[in-house]
């Protein structure tokens, strides 16, 4: 074309790719007229070959030996449709998936994918990106309208030795890709997804292994914390035991009531001073005293100097004696071994240890009868038979070698009870004389037996005081535990001297 003397090149229109047209109608080799809805199907001896892309109005008879015919297979995307006749299977065409941009593949073919049978999956296919990498189009469905505006319909029926197929309508859309190729592509895509998933799992496993190596698990951490706290507690207990072994406890005193005779009565003073430097709160007036002298009692409530009694710790809080430590027990045993060979000293030393035979007072197997009456002494009391030395003068006390060495202190005595102070307080403080003298006949006999069997070397020291003290007509006995009194009579009482001191 020439315009104003200049040739003009006309643009050549680009060819638009057209979908592959449907094949022509399929013809059967069996020239028999029949319909799928007939009550009786004709019998034939020759069968047609299986055709995946049957198109148009056609009737085909397949052999029962054909696998594709038994599966009702077809190249077209067909789905099952409801049918009123249970003997006839009805299927309808779903069309084809095409690219909205009408793109061409490198091999010159157009994009025509097979639609999914499931409605939900088919809806997902619509609007997806075109599988062609060089195309920005979207997939869309071209529906089949080849049967009077409705999808092409296929009918399948099995009767006798043949499978009868009948199609109604002609497909107005290109062929979709074959079912086999679609499945192959899906398998390939699935393999890629599986490989990607395997890579992701491998990476996640490596990451979890690294995290596990960097930090212990929760259970391991809890176990380690429990073991650590247990080791800490054990270490603390070991340190505490070591400290307790290193610390030497101070000398402690247990309460007894061992008064010595005194002529002064003063209730305003009463304090105990332990050995060594320390402070003690008075149990009478709550005053604190700091002393460094030997343990002793000042003039107390009853104006008696308290000696260290070898008796039980359950009688009174008025006096104290030292508990036997291992060193003191060894010293006591050593003193007992030397006592038969040594002479009795003149003075009594209260700081000497107590004999191990009477270190705890009343033994655990002794029982005290708290039901004894004033007119009967039938109730057994351990002090009536075992602790006779508590009511005897110091000269008659042979329970301990170190404590039976004072022959001149006849006025002092031991007792295991403090209740006697409140009952006979006037007598102890220098009251009127009486014929009551606390001497036990059983104690005397027991003492003589012990002197002959265990302490033969003290017989000459004890004989004269015993003869002098057998002078009681009746006496009172108090167990020191139940505050009950027993009265016993002695017909052989002959007073020796009315001026002798009275002991309760």
Swiss-Prot record:
Its main location: nucleus. Residues 214-237, 313-357 are annotated as: Disordered. It comes from the Eukaryota. This is Transcription factor glial cells missing. Keywords: Developmental protein, DNA-binding, Nucleus, Transcription, Transcription regulation. One of its GO terms (molecular function) is DNA-binding transcription factor activity, RNA polymerase II-specific. Residues 313-325 have a biased composition (Polar residues). Coiled coil: none annotated. The keyword Magnesium does not apply. It comes from Drosophila melanogaster. PANTHER family: GLIAL CELLS MISSING RELATED/GLIDE, TRANSCRIPTION FACTOR GLIAL CELLS MISSING-RELATED. InterPro entries: GCM, GCM_dom_sf, GCM_large, GCM_small, Tscrpt_reg_GCM. GO terms for cellular component: nucleus. Disruption phenotype: Flies exhibit failure of glia to differentiate in the CNS and in the PNS, glia are transformed into neurons. Ectopic expression causes neurons to transform to glia. It is found in: Nucleus. Transcription factor that induces gliogenesis. It determines the choice between glial and neuronal fates. Also has a role in the differentiation of the plasmatocyte/macrophage lineage of hemocytes. One of its GO terms (biological process) is positive regulation of glial cell differentiation.
């Amino acid at each position: 074309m020439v315009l104003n003397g200049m040739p003009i090149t006309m643009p050549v229109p680009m060819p638009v790719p057209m979908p592959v047209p449907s094949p022509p109608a399929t013809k059967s080799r069996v020239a028999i007229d029949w319909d799928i809805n007939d009550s009786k199907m004709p019998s034939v001896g020759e069968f047609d070959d299986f055709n995946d892309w049957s198109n148009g109005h056609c009737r085909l008879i397949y052999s029962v030996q054909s696998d594709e015919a038994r599966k009702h297979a077809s190249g077209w995307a067909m789905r099952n449709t409801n049918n009123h006749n249970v003997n006839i299977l009805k299927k309808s065409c779903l069309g084809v998936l095409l690219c909205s941009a009408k793109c061409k593949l490198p091999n010159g073919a157009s994009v025509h994918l097979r639609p999914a049978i499931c409605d939900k999956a088919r809806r997902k296919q619509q609007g997806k990106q075109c599988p062609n990498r060089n195309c920005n189009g979207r997939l869309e469905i071209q529906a089949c309208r080849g049967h009077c505006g409705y999808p092409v319909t296929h009918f399948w029926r099995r009767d006798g030795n043949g499978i009868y197929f009948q199609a109604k309508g002609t497909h107005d859309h290109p062929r979709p890709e074959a079912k086999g190729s679609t499945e192959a592509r899906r398998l390939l895509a699935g393999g890629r997804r599986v490989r990607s998933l395997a890579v992701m799992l491998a990476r996640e496993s490596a990451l979890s292994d690294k995290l596990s190596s960097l930090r212990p698990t929760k259970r391991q951490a809890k176990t380690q914390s429990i073991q650590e706290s247990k080791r800490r507690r054990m270490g603390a207990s070991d340190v505490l035991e070591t400290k307790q072994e290193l610390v030497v406890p101070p000398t402690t005193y247990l309460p007894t009531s061992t008064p010595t005779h005194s002529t002064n009565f003063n209730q305003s003073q009463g304090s105990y001073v332990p050995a060594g430097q320390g402070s003690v709160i008075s149990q009478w007036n709550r005053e604190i005293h700091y002393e460094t002298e030997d343990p002793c009692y000042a003039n107390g409530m009853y104006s008696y100097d308290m000696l260290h009694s070898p008796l039980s710790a359950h009688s009174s809080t008025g006096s104290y004696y030292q508990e036997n430590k291992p060193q003191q027990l060894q010293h006591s045993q050593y003193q007992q071994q030397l006592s038969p060979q040594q002479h009795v000293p003149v003075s009594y030393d209260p700081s000497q240890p107590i004999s191990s035979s009477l270190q705890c007072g009343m033994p655990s197997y002794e029982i005290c009868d708290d039901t004894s009456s004033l007119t009967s002494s039938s109730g057994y009391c351990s002090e009536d038979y075992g602790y006779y030395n508590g009511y005897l003068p110091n000269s008659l006390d042979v329970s301990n070698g170190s404590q039976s060495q004072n022959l001149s202190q006849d006025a002092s005595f031991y007792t295991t009870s403090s209740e006697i102070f409140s009952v006979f307080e006037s007598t102890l403080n220098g009251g009127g004389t009486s014929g009551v003298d606390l001497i036990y006949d059983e104690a005397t006999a027991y003492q003589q037996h012990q002197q002959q069997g265990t302490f033969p070397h003290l017989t000459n020291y004890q004989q004269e005081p015993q003869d002098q003290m057998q002078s009681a007509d009746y006496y009172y006995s108090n167990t020191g535990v139940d505050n009950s009194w027993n009265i016993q009579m002695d017909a052989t009482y002959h007073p020796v001297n009315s001026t002798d001191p009275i002991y309760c």
